[in-house]
Amino acid sequence: MEEQTILRKFEHIKHCLTKNVEAHVTNGFEDVHLIHKSLPEIDKDEIDLSVKFLGRKFDYPIMITGMTGGTRKGEIAWRINRTLAQAAQELNIPLGLGSQRAMIEKPETWESYYVRDVAPDVFLVGNLGAPQFGRNAKKRYSVDEVLYAIEKIEADAIAIHMNPLQESIQPEGDTTFSGVLEALAEITSTIDYPVIAKETGAGVSKEVAVELEAVGVDAIDISGLGGTSWSAVEYYRTKDGEKRNLALKFWDWGIKTAISLAEVRWATNLPIIASGGMRDGITMAKALAMGASMVGIALPVLRPAAKGDVEGVIRIIKGYAEEIRNVMFLVGARNIKELRKVPLVITGFVREWLLQRIDLNSYLRARFKM
């Protein structure tokens, strides 16, 4: 099982780097419209992109979300995480790591997650999977594993990733999700670190968001449909014909990022990381205007990170930041707080969905609360 976990990490990285693993559908932000302001009444140079999130101040509202880990020192996951960490250190943005299950099963892989020597100041988020906390898990994790995952790598927070879609498709998937909320309640009430509930490409509904808020999580990474599809990744991994067919059918399963963001913002008071198909700064600005505290990216920086290209990662993120800044100038927003107050027009499929699921006018007011 332990060697299988490490092999799976290699395969996930390989397919994300070499195959088209993105959803065939959009993340929904084409239906979200910001209103151009011909007289912004601000100077572009005065725009401030800094944000506060989970008690820390960051220079940009962009987080590198968890991707990988679990290979040995000197191997690809080690190189990816160290490259991303150096970029995050330079930019003063938070960094998430990939699942640390491999580290728990094979402790010698811990160095592929350890980046403090190159990123002493980065807000670092560890990562464990929800099914390992299910009451029927083969080796059920407890608070002890959570603290080990955080403290061994000197992280500042922990993400518990919710990936039922991926697990249901994966040949060796764990679908033991009963009892996870109970486990989350114990974790949040016991540890002194922020806990982020993180989806993995299929989005979070308002109902699940309310449950997560009730058990005390500190933030939600909605990771909606429209970016990397983990059903697609598993499609390329499996050799089993039935599993491949299942993966193909569920390639585009989930809640679009824009929809998930609106639902979670309307239903809870939690900080939100909006990830899932964030491929340009205009989309990111829309997400921030819709009430996200941060936006999250992963796949766009994976390729330069795999090459050890720190400057390449920095260049991509600074490009996104400049695009966000330009949007803010064109809508007359001096800072992210003001961006959340600019007019929004929501049309098309996203509007139709939200009219059935939430009070749209109430939501448009609720986005001011963070």
Swiss-Prot record:
Binding-site list for FMN: T65, G66, M67, T68, S99, N127, K198, S223, T228, G277, M278, R279, A298, L299
Binding site for Mg(2+): E167
Keyword annotations from UniProtKB, A to Z: Cytoplasm, Flavoprotein, FMN, Isomerase, Isoprene biosynthesis, Magnesium, Metal-binding, NADP
InterPro entries membership: Aldolase_TIM (IPR013785), FMN-dep_DH (IPR000262), IPdP_isomerase (IPR011179)
Enzyme class, broadest EC rank: isomerase
EC number per UniProt: 5.3.3.2
Domain of life (superkingdom): Archaea
Residues where substrate binds: R8, K9, S99, Q100, R101, Q166
GO MF term list: FMN binding; isopentenyl-diphosphate delta-isomerase activity; magnesium ion binding; NADPH binding; oxidoreductase activity
A Pfam family assignment: FMN_dh
Location relative to the cell: Cytoplasm
One GO biological process term: isoprenoid biosynthetic process
Reaction catalysis annotation: isopentenyl diphosphate = dimethylallyl diphosphate
GO CC term (a single one): cytoplasm
Annotated SMART domains: IMPDH
Cofactor: FMN; NADPH; Mg(2+)
UniProt cross-references to NCBIfam families, sorted A to Z: IPP_isom_2
Similarity comment text for this entry: Belongs to the IPP isomerase type 2 family.
Quaternary state and interactors: Homooctamer. Dimer of tetramers.
Role, per record: Involved in the biosynthesis of isoprenoids. Catalyzes the 1,3-allylic rearrangement of the homoallylic substrate isopentenyl (IPP) to its allylic isomer, dimethylallyl diphosphate (DMAPP).
Descriptive protein name: Isopentenyl-diphosphate delta-isomerase
Organism annotation: Pyrococcus abyssi (strain GE5 / Orsay)
